Amino acid sequence: MLNGKTALVTGSTSGIGLGIAKALAAQGANIIVNGFGDADAAKAEIAQAGQGIRVGYHGADMSKAAEIEDMMRYAQSDFGGADILVNNAGIQHVAAIEDFPPERWDAIIAINLTSAFHTTRLALPGMKQKDWGRIINVASTHGLVASAQKSAYVAAKHGIVGFTKVTALETAQTGVTANAICPGWVLTPLVQKQVEARAQKEGIPVEQAKRELVLEKQPSGQFVTPDELGALAVFLSSEAARQVRGAIWNMDGGWVAQ
């Protein structure tokens, strides 16, 4: 379905980004990996998911505009540009507003929000020239609702939601679409560690700890998975989604419906 297309997925060496990259690869897209995790392992997983595709890597620090610009030049020179751009890179810090370190605020806004502006502004000219492109911003349920202690993350994710809508309006009469995915709790290695710590602290089975953690926010009592988010990204990249523009699609087990 995506043969001949190239997808650049930021923050794709693990978790959600890796799941999305593998799903796009399985549909024939070449993949450019980015992130601070094990790049070789991620590239191997992605290559296995998509037989015969090309997989590249650029280790741009998404808080630095100059490195993002270098990554986008790499995408253009080595792959002919990014046809599908998935802005997924993100970090988190939890603290009350009055205790929130200003440098952590700046880093979260830079990586979770400003990086998407830089990748988008640099990808759009090529997409418009081809009259085809897909921009998928990985926001969060925290782009729609808030939780205490997460001021920077919530601000950044609300910003991504607004930025997605503006991008969709500015590309509405082109073959380029822009949409956002808002995951709830996702079962990633980082979250699994939180589950295991809770189980140990409370002396309960891991499965019980997992369910209790999820039920605090998600009525379904089940985690979203990177594979499920990957399937949604594939749909948003498809021709069937050519008129899906500016959608803010939550996949959250009912979190935001409450």
From Swiss-Prot:
Which annotated residues bind NAD(+)?
Answer: 8-32
The kind of enzyme this is, by top-level EC class, is oxidoreductase
Q: What is its EC number?
A: 1.1.1.30
**Superkingdom to which the source organism belongs:** Bacteria
CDD domains hit by this protein: HBDH_SDR_c
Q: So what does this thing catalyse?
A: (R)-3-hydroxybutanoate + NAD(+) = acetoacetate + NADH + H(+)
InterPro entries in the record: 3-OHbutyrate_DH, NAD(P)-bd_dom_sf, Sc_DH/Rdtase_CS, SDR, SDR_fam
List the SUPFAM superfamilies.
NAD(P)-binding Rossmann-fold domains
One of the GO BP terms on file = monocarboxylic acid metabolic process
Q: Would the keyword Flavoprotein turn up in this protein's UniProt record?
A: no
Record-listed substrate binding positions: 140
Keyword tags? NAD, Oxidoreductase
Positions annotated as active site in the UniProt record: 153 (proton acceptor)
MF terms from GO for this chain are: 3-hydroxybutyrate dehydrogenase activity
Family statement drawn from the similarity comment of this UniProt entry: Belongs to the short-chain dehydrogenases/reductases (SDR) family.
Q: What is this protein called?
A: D-beta-hydroxybutyrate dehydrogenase
This chain's source organism reads Cupriavidus necator (strain ATCC 17699 / DSM 428 / KCTC 22496 / NCIMB 10442 / H16 / Stanier 337)
